[in-house]
Every structure is written in C-alpha cells, then in structure tokens.
Amino acid sequence: MKRLLLAATALAAFLGCARVEKYTTFEDSFVTVTDAVPDVILEIRYYGTYNFVGDRIDGYLQPTALLTREAAKALKEVSDDVISQGYRLKIYDAYRPQMGVDHFVRWAADQKDVRMKEFFYPDLDKSVLFEQDYIMAKSGHTRGSTVDLTLFDMATEKEVDMGGTFDWFGEESHPDFCGNPETGEYTGGVSAAGRSITEQQFRNRMILRKAMLDHGFKPLDSEWWHFTLKDEPYPETYFNHPVKQLDK
C-alpha cells in the first residue's frame, strides 16, 4: 500500500509539472508579428485615432502587432497560402492589453462621446453597445491568439473590397450576411438599414475565411475580420502588457 501511495504521489507530481505552461514570461510567450510573418502589412487602428473611439487606445505604445508564438506560427502558414493566391495579409489589431479593453468600456459608458458614430455605428444608439455585445469587459484579443485582418491585393496594391470596414457595428459585418459561410454560397439580401454586399465582396470574405480556417483559426459569427487560434495556449489568461516591439 505504501508503495502504491508513493507511486500515486509521484504520478500526481509528474502530471502537475506537465500542466505547467511552456513559457513563463510575456516576452517568452509572444512575438512581434512582423518578425514571424515578414510579409504582413500593418495598419494598427488603435494606435491612431481612426477607430470607433476616436483616440489612441490605452496600452498601444507603438504601431506594431503582437501574438503568441503559436498563433504567429499559424499566421505564417496563412500568409504563405494567400501569397500563392496573389494577396498579402493586412492586420488591424492582434494582441490587445486589458488596459485597452478597459478604455473601450469607459468610452462606451460616456453617452455624449459620439465623435465617430457616422463612421462606425451610424445605425445604432451608443446605449445598446453593451447589451448587443459590441463592447465587453473581456476580449479574446487579450489572451494573445486573436487577430483582426483583411486581404491586400498585390496586383492592384489596394485592400481587397470586403463590402464593409473593420469595426463596423452592424449585421453587415457578420460572416453570414448575404450568404452562407459554411458553403460559400451567396444569397444576397439587405440589412435592416437597407445595405447589401455584392457577390464578389462576399466571395472576397470567403477567401480570407477559408485561408484562416485551413490553418487552425476559428471565426467569430459577428465579425468577418476576426479569427482566433483554435488551440490557443492561454485560453484563461488575460494579459496587460503594452503593445510595443519585442526583442527577437
């Protein structure tokens, strides 16, 4: 019996060690995306003022993008895939510190600040942003394996027309708007606000979606640009390290 207890204790200790996360510091766990995926283009919206808040967001110290090592590795595969089709990836946001999410929450609570309404949420009253989950106190971005992005056409040297802008608050941003993302079938239709997207715009969204899903990412049902690594390494951890270039 004593030997059995000792064996059980040893096994428990081993399993406990096996559950220890591979990386122990932020700098070890994350990489600067352009170091891992050199072909990407960055337009970090929250470093500038052209975003739904209208200000630079807290925690964005440099116009760069960070991801966990695992997510960056998968994104490199996506990049290679779309390059073979004539595109590059363009990133709007990746890892987002908790202080940035807190900034969103404070902004959403200020009903008087509607500076950017006409550009990002013209059909919504700001008071519904919480109840409709456009703004939340926690974000998957803060776990470090989520990225917001689009496609850039290498032939035209322009963003691919997706029929809607990044961070548009409305049904027009949903992957199933005007089509079935599971089958890729375009169905047409109009939103409650009378908007629509063309078949080509829907198919452009599907090109991005397929490339991301083929290489280990999962989509969000309310944003065509938002993808999270399926096997994200820190599913319960919300980081607060600022966004800035990391040492290689």
Pin down the residues of each PLM region.
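Positively charged n-region of N-terminal signal peptides that target proteins for export
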Residues: 1-4
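Intrinsically disordered, low-complexity segments enriched in polar/charged small residues
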Residues: 7-8, 231
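Extracytoplasmic cell-surface/polysaccharide-interacting catalytic and binding patches
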Residues: 18-94, 101-221, 232-248
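Conserved metal-phosphate-binding beta-hairpin within the catalytic cores
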Residues: 227
